[in-house]
């Protein structure tokens, strides 16, 4: 009788992928990256195990925001002091800190809790085209669609 394969931390082969975000739509790119970080592209995917790969996302400053999201999409944060709410539009955040824009988008698509935190640590976002991970010999990843 065959048994269903269950991955665990010891038998997971992790790869490194480079994805160029230039001209890509933010939401579509984020969902694809979240899927890679989770390991859903592998036949050995196990929901309760971190079996994803490392993703290096370059050119985050050249991401495309469709529609009016650059002006209409608002990100909020609070300092926990009275009247301490701050807001910034997606377009302003892309100009000021494109890395945080992509990290926020991708983190929202990962599982909540400690497993999602482990998956998120395998994401490496850079505003420009350069990254310091050449020693890991990353492969270029072609997005679907």
From Swiss-Prot:
This protein is one of the early assembly proteins of the 50S ribosomal subunit, although it is not seen to bind rRNA by itself. It is important during the early stages of 50S assembly. Keywords: Ribonucleoprotein, Ribosomal protein. Gene3D superfamilies: Ribosomal protein L13. Part of the 50S ribosomal subunit. Belongs to the universal ribosomal protein uL13 family. The keyword Ribosomal protein applies. GO terms for cellular component: cytosolic large ribosomal subunit. It holds the Pfam family Ribosomal_L13. CDD domains: Ribosomal_L13. GO terms for molecular function: mRNA binding; structural constituent of ribosome. GO terms for biological process: negative regulation of translation; translation. This is Large ribosomal subunit protein uL13. It comes from the Bacteria. The keyword NADP does not apply.
